[in-house]
Amino acid sequence: MSPSDVPINWKRNLTVTWLGCFLTGAAFSLVMPFLPLYVEQLGVTGHSALNMWSGLVFSITFLFSAIASPFWGGLADRKGRKIMLLRSALGMAIVMLLMGMAQNIWQFLILRALLGLLGGFIPNANALIATQVPRHKSGWALGTLSTGGVSGALLGPLAGGLLAGHYGLRPVFFITASVLFICFLLTFFFIRENFLPVSKKEILHVREVVASLKNPRLVLSLFVTTLIIQVATGSIAPILTLYVRELAGNVSNIAFISGMIASVPGVAALLSAPRLGKLGDRIGPEKILIVALIISVLLLIPMSFVQTPWQLALLRFLLGAADGALLPAVQTLLVYNSTNQIAGRIFSYNQSFRDIGNVTGPLMGAAISASYGFRAVFCVTAGVVLFNAIYSWNSLRRRRLAIE
């Protein structure tokens, strides 16, 4: 029996990677509530300049992550996924530490770009688990894993706000670096992977990767679905607080109401993702994907007609429950339509599309709201998701006809 054939405890790996994704999600979102304040502290003054630099330092991380992800994915397929998890956690910890020492906005911008280049813990965690878990449990495992990052992202802003209030802005970066270093230690000591390194000559090139896919068109449609999921999520983010203020009128606790409405989809996804992932293992992830996309459309449209913040909160909770099924369903279908040999690159390509969606979504939402108002954003987003539902259904139908 070769080393790669030795059984490993994938359930323990799932638990540890869940903790790693939780810590990574929390670490990234810890600094988000006060990012514009830190930009201001670094010497940027004036409303327009502050808006421009805040947008730049936010989006540049996703942009550089989209560029770097395929490279790291290829390296993961050559050297193993565990070493990529270690590289990502340690690299991000060092960059976060340096961010707390930044003296001007250019240093901070470069470090935010470097954070994107060195990131990739969550897609590599997905690739690791996808290659270890039994195929018939992929939906449940990837759905469960997705709740780690969601949980961290939900708790991160709250913890970041509290820490910044007590200790100031710079110490939060040092605390975040410590959290990421803990993630590195957990990965180093507790994650097991049996991986035989592949030489550079043996690694498949992009054309060979595409040729090895069971259904290249379907995989491309899944990448597009990931992009549109993030566009739909991100398009609402820039206008949410302003829309809530328009609905609520003059109330003193608008920040609390907006924060609650912003977080309810994450709570719903946290509850629904493992259950819908398990259901997908039974009835097929493709059915879960199409139904969840259609439900998302049916929930986005009435959001443009709500009259109170609580109506919006209810619809966003239901939308979060549906969205909790989307990315795990996409990831499960990627597992079904690729091999372990190329899993790192497939998940990294998917991450690149996700990052592109993270950049373009807020830009789309801001442009639509500036031209047509807040309510139009929900209608246009619903149209984009509807297009994706039809496109995905057509791709899955072609696959089914090809099999028959």
Curated annotation (Swiss-Prot):
Tell me if Transmembrane is a UniProt keyword of this record: yes
**Taxonomic lineage per UniProt?**
Bacteria, Pseudomonadati, Pseudomonadota, Gammaproteobacteria, Enterobacterales
The molecule here is called Multidrug resistance protein MdtG
Transmembrane segments in this chain: where?
19-39, 56-76, 90-110, 113-133, 149-169, 171-191, 222-242, 254-274, 288-308, 317-337, 376-396
Q: Which InterPro entries match?
A: MFS, MFS_dom, MFS_MdtG_subfamily, MFS_sugar_transport-like, MFS_trans_sf, Mutidrug-R_MdtG, Tet-R_TetA/multi-R_MdtG-like
Q: Which HAMAP family match?
A: MFS_MdtG
- Where does it reside? Cell inner membrane
Output the Gene Ontology terms for molecular function.
Answer: transmembrane transporter activity
This protein's encoding gene: mdtG
Keyword terms of this UniProt record: Cell inner membrane, Cell membrane, Membrane, Transmembrane, Transmembrane helix, Transport
GO annotations of cellular component type? plasma membrane
Taking the first listed entry, what is the main subcellular location of this protein, grouped into a coarse class? membrane
User: Which Pfam families does the annotation name?
Assistant: MFS_1 (PF07690), Sugar_tr (PF00083)
The record's comment on protein family reads: Belongs to the major facilitator superfamily. DHA1 family. MdtG (TC 2.A.1.2.20) subfamily.
Q: How does it sit in the membrane?
A: Multi-pass membrane protein
